[in-house]
Regions:
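Membrane-embedded, hydrophobic transmembrane alpha-helices
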Residues: 1-96
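Extracytoplasmic
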Residues: 12-18, 470, 494-653
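Membrane-interface helix-loop junctions at the exits of transmembrane helices
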Residues: 46-49, 114-118, 146, 217-236, ...
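Membrane-helix boundary/interfacial segments in multi-pass membrane proteins
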Residues: 57-62, 124-129, 179, 232-245, ...
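Active-site lumenal/periplasmic loops and adjacent helix-entry segments of GT-C-fold
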Residues: 106-248, 265, 513-525
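Membrane-interface alpha helices of multi-pass inner-membrane proteins
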Residues: 268, 272-290
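Perimembrane helix-loop-helix junctions
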Residues: 296-331
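Hydrophobic, aromatic-rich transmembrane alpha-helices
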Residues: 305, 379-403
Length: 653
């Protein structure tokens, strides 16, 4: 299987992510680059919310998504009509140079990130050999088989009432509409999220923060591909597939929030449209992973202060001086709401057991240099970030932007270096106290800060006498061939040099580490070559209605996702009853123990996958009852590849 054969699926994935959102945004009056940047976020919201609404109105989950899309289109059109003026013409690029810069920035980012991700994935049907992937892959199969795609239904697969399912919904939609296998659909969605949604959002955020500057968006495109901590880290650690989608959507949501607050460099939307856009993009990100929405709320605290400060400086115009107090009361109320949510929108403490990994000094160094988790320094990125931060802090009107960056780096410093006390639990327990999750958030603001630093340096260089004189001569040539040639050469040089200086060991090491997680080898941590070959034979050897037992820690539960055969436990940490416990611990004793056969009859188990004792985390959790079934007379070997065995239970017939 090659990626060339999957081009139709990749095109289908692009259409699935873009078309519904484009339709809603168009009817809402959005045009220009924001239309493209906002479309995927809108689509994810439509699909994930539609999956929740569908069972409430008696529809299938895909039909529910269509219904929500139709309703959103109607609402968008109504909002656009109500404002009674076009909000889009001002969003059109001002000249051909900026249009070309946007196109080049997106194209360069897609190529730089896309080629890394394709190399990491290897084959289109590869899958991450990590703990969390057992749940993620099986959840997609669960949606496809049951139609239960709601965030309040998917978790039931593992005994939970709630699990954010937006990522799973999008993969299931791609698998269903694109007629693709689950691993291929997973890789297609992650590729689109990392190589398309993420850079689109980064460029959009830079546009909202700093305005329309060609060099700035070019730098933003290149820099979106310059951090090993996203998207590569989230495809390596966990694997945290939902976080990949959620964090990829965060720059768009942050840009929409800045616009809604009226803090954007060029506010061209009426307030109603601005706030509706923010409301529309937020559900998808939240239902992908709510911790990312918590990050958004925290990062917006400096923006709230900036807004209050600006409003308090406005002249009274005959009003009572009390009007200057209201903005600050609003800030206090906002902080109160965020503080409350911080205490309730989090996992239980028992699940937040990750420990600090370094000293505070080292954590600060990693945060500001973009070298989280010990990656090498990319000096160009560090220098641009340092200059950008210095420039932003030196200007009163942009200090709030620098503060947003410091919020995210501060979280990383806390989680990776602070003592395991109540303060650390309160601040970073939202992310399970897991350093990689917070390391992945830093690029959200590091990209615009570094891009701004690069643009300011270029602006400074352009003011040097010799350079300024040369630029003046070029401008005097108007739009002639020589002028166009110089502009193109300059743009190519900027992109080429910045790409060369940023695609260094930081990215390479992150990619190499992630690639190891996707390799099927004889000693792979989850599924070995032999085990995968045996899973591929199940279609011919196990009836469709059969139930298979196995130690989920060894990857046997992936028979559900990869072979479409029901397994006794669909998630490694799923809860199970006494009968299942009896099978796991005593099935081998079935010939002499009537209680075992009662458990077999009660659960309906027919087969056992024995993948040995090698577990994904290198620990032995027992499951001794599933071993040596043929030797004890409890079962017979139906098939075997290497040490991987498929048993049929025969003792209880």
């Amino acid at each position: 299987m090659s990626w060339w054969s999957e081009v139709p699926l990749l095109l289908a994935t692009t259409g699935i992510f873009l078309l519904p959102g484009l339709l809603v945004a168009l009817l809402g009056g959005v045009r220009g680059y924001p239309l493209l940047a906002l479309a995927p976020a809108l689509t994810v919201s439509l699909v994930s919310v539609g999956s929740i609404v569908a069972p409430m109105v008696g529809l299938g989950w895909i039909a529910g998504s269509v219904l929500v899309t139709v309703l959103a289109c109607a609402a968008a059109f109504a909002a656009s009509w109500w404002t009674r003026r076009s909000v889009t013409r001002r969003d059109q690029p001002r000249d051909w140079k900026y249009t070309a810069a946007l196109a080049a920035a997106v194209a360069v980012a897609v190529v730089l990130i896309g080629r890394r991700l394709l190399w990491v994935f290897g084959e289109p049907d590869s899958f991450s050999q990590t703990f969390d992937n057992v749940f993620h892959l099986n959840a997609i199969r669960y949606i496809l088989e049951t139609g239960a795609a709601s965030t309040f239904e998917v978790g039931r697969m593992a005994g939970n009432d709630y699990y954010p399912a937006a990522w799973h919904d999008m993969v299931a939609l791609v698998a269903e509409l694109g007629s693709a296998g689950i691993p291929v659909a997973v890789n297609a969605v992650n590729l689109f999220a990392g190589a398309v949604i993420w850079p689109l959002g980064c460029i959009y955020l830079v546009q909202q923060l700093f305005g329309r500057k060609s060099a700035l968006v070019l730098l933003a495109g290149v820099l979106s591909a310059a951090f090993g901590s996203f998207p590569l880290l989230m495809l390596d650690h966990g694997v945290l597939n939902p976080n990949v989608l959620a964090i990829a959507l965060l720059p768009v949501a942050l840009g929409a929030a800045v616009n809604a607050l009226g803090l954007a460099a060029e506010v061209s939307y009426p307030p109603l449209v601005r706030w509706l856009l923010l409301v529309a993009v937020s559900p998808g990100m939240t239902l992908a992973h709510p911790s990312t929405t918590m990050a958004l709320l925290a990062v917006l605290i400096p923006a709230a202060f900036a807004l209050a400060f600006r409003k308090s400086l406005k002249p009274a115009d005959g009003r009572s001086p009390v009007h200057k107090v209201w903005p600050w009361l609003g800030v206090a109320a906002y902080i109160g709401v965020v503080a409350y949510l911080w205490t309730v929108a989090r996992p239980v403490e028992a699940a937040s057991t990750w420990v600090p990994i370094q000293s505070t000094g080292q954590a600060i160094g990693e945060a500001v240099t973009g070298t989280a988790l010990g990656r090498p320094v990319t000096w160009a990125v560090f220098i641009l970030t340092a200059f950008g931060l210095a420039f932003l802090l030196s200007q009163r009107g942009t200090r709030w932007i620098a503060s947003m960056y410091l919020v995210l780096t501060g979280f990383y410093v806390v989680v990776s270096s602070f003592p395991q006390d109540d303060l650390r639990m309160y601040l970073t327990g939202v992310w399970y106290n897991d350093s990689p999750r917070l390391a992945a958030l830093i690029p959200v603001m590091a990209v615009p800060v570094a891009a701004y630093g690069g643009w300011k340096l270029l602006d400074w260089a352009s003011r040097l006498p010799a350079v300024a004189a040369g630029l003046a001569r070029i401008r005097n040539k108007a739009a002639g061939p020589a002028y166009v040639a110089v502009v193109l050469v300059g743009a190519v040089a900027l992109v080429g040099v910045s790409a060369y200086l940023t695609q260094k060991a930081n990215i390479r090491q992150a990619a190499e580490s992630a690639k190891r997680s996707y390799e099927v080898t004889p000693d792979a941590s989850l599924i070995s070559n032999d085990e995968l070959e045996l899973l591929e034979r199940l279609d011919d050897e196990v009836p469709e209605d059969a139930l298979i037992a196995g130690n989920p820690w060894t990857g046997s539960s992936l028979a559900y996702a990869l072979a479409d055969r029901q397994t006794l436990q669909l998630h490694i940490l799923a809860t199970y009853g006494d009968d299942v416990d009896t099978i796991y611990n005593r099935l081998r004793d079935a010939p002499a123990d009537p209680e075992v056969c009662q458990a077999v009859e009660s659960t309906g188990v027919d087969y056992v996958l024995d993948f040995g004792t090698k577990e994904v985390h290198g620990i032995d959790h027992g499951f001794v009852g599933l071993r040596d079934l043929e030797e004890t007379g409890a079962g017979r070997v139906v098939d075997q590849v290497g040490e991987a065995k498929l048993y049929e239970i025969t003792a209880c017939r």
